[in-house]
């Protein structure tokens, strides 16, 4: 390989379609709000009674994030602590969440259906991300709700081998699937979801790396449609706190990477431990700093500055059965103009040789080129 170009998205953003992130906060239905506040109060009392106990912190984080999306079947919640008298670890009750109707469709789910129908009406397939996929399987619940609405839906499971996931997506598109649901970690690297220009984070999780990778799966070389990323959460819940703190950490991370100069370096120590930050908010009954909406608006604004999309095609016509997946633009065309006639190696392809020109049996250049002429 004589020439290889490593480019960042900002280097080719002029050739990419617009990218937009939207934060959607949904108020809870009255029965759920009452049950959630009840659970929140019980966990708050446990946090105060067992200060610094990591088992209570872990229960707090996971339970308050998943309960609004799966408000049944959680059972009694237990913490653990060492009893000096018994000289062993003992369990204690933290809370007993109230079970709501399993067959009900709640406000955030209704909002999700509304957003998906809106996107499908524009001919845009949707990718949904949810992080609770095992014991309290939110993905299966969402699929059932979408199936009942007549929306053709598939769920990507971890059982599909990494090397076969691209082919799995191609099959779903060919079979007429309109929505795919999966954990964001399953697609965070190595997949270009060009057929799914709309991404909905039904649950974000609290891994900044996973969120950053998964949110860009559609915004890649070869994408021809504007990309929309939407984050859904229940208003005034741990989901809101999590998204807001994730947004602040992302602002700090981008600032440290030199992507842009923004506020936030002073808040690294304050919000670096998300678990402690969310526990503090719960105990003190108030948010810390800006609202989640304000943080994500700031992120979106900085993104527009960082990735100006001035020379892009924004055709947003409905998709046909002949998918973009099978007819992508040649990625080399987007960067080819920046170089001379030297061939560019595109991943997965060999550079074409002019007709009549023989391939050399052995390269005459050293294995690794030297920038300074040193051997």
Segments the model singles out, each with a brief description of its role:
Residues 14-32, 50-180, 185-191, 262-264, ...:
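Conserved Helicase C-terminal RecA-like lobe
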Residues 123-127, 141, 151, 276-375:
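C-terminal accessory regions of helicase/translocase ATPases
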Residues 43-51:
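Short, polar/flexible loop-turn hinges at active-site or ligand-entry regions and domain interfaces
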Residues 1, 64, 246:
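A residue-level signal for conserved active-site and pocket-lining positions in enzyme catalytic cores
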Residues 206-215, 219-308:
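A conserved SF2-helicase RecA2
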Residues 1-8, 223-226:
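Conserved P-loop NTPase motor "coupling/switch" region that bridges the ATPase
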Residues 152-245, 249:
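Conserved RecA-like P-loop NTPase helicase motor core
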Residues 34-37:
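Long amphipathic alpha-helical segments
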């Amino acid at each position: 390989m004589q020439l290889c170009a490593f480019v960042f998205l900002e280097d080719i953003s002029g050739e990419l379609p617009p990218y937009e992130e939207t934060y959607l906060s949904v108020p809870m239905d009255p029965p759920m709000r009452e049950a959630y506040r009840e659970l929140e109060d019980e966990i708050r009392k446990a946090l105060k009674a067992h200060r610094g106990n990591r088992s209570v912190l872990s229960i707090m984080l996971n339970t308050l994030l998943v309960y609004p999306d799966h408000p049944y079947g959680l059972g009694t919640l237990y913490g653990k602590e060492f009893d000096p008298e018994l000289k062993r670890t003992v369990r204690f009750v933290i809370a007993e969440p109230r079970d709501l109707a399993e067959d009900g469709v709640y406000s955030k789910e209704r909002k999700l259906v509304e957003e998906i129908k809106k996107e499908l009406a524009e001919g845009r397939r949707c990718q949904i991300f949810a992080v609770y996929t095992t014991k309290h399987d939110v993905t299966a619940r969402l699929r059932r709700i979408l199936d009942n609405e007549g929306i053709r839906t598939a769920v990507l499971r971890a059982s599909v081998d990494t090397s076969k996931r691209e082919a799995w997506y191609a099959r779903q598109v060919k079979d007429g699937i309109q929505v795919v649901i999966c954990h964001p970690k399953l697609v965070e690297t190595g997949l270009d979801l060009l057929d799914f220009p709309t991404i909905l984070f039904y649950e974000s999780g609290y891994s900044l790396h996973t969120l950053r990778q998964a949110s860009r799966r559609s915004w890649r070389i070869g994408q021809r449609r504007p990309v929309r990323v939407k984050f859904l959460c229940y208003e005034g819940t741990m989901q809101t706190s999590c998204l807001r703190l994730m947004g602040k950490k992302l602002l700090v991370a981008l600032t440290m990477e030199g992507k842009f100069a923004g506020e936030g370096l002073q808040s690294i120590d304050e919000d670096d431990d998300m678990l402690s930050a969310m526990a503090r908010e719960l105990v003190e009954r108030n948010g810390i700093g800006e609202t989640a909406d304000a943080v994500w608006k700031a992120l979106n604004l900085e993104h527009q500055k960082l990735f100006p999309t001035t020379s892009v095609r924004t055709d947003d016509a409905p998709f046909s059965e002949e998918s973009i997946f099978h007819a992508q633009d040649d990625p080399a065309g987007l960067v080819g103009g920046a170089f001379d006639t030297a061939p560019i190696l595109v991943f997965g392809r060999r550079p074409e040789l002019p007709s009549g020109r023989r391939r050399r049996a052995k390269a005459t250049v050293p294995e690794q080129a030297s920038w300074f002429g040193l051997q």
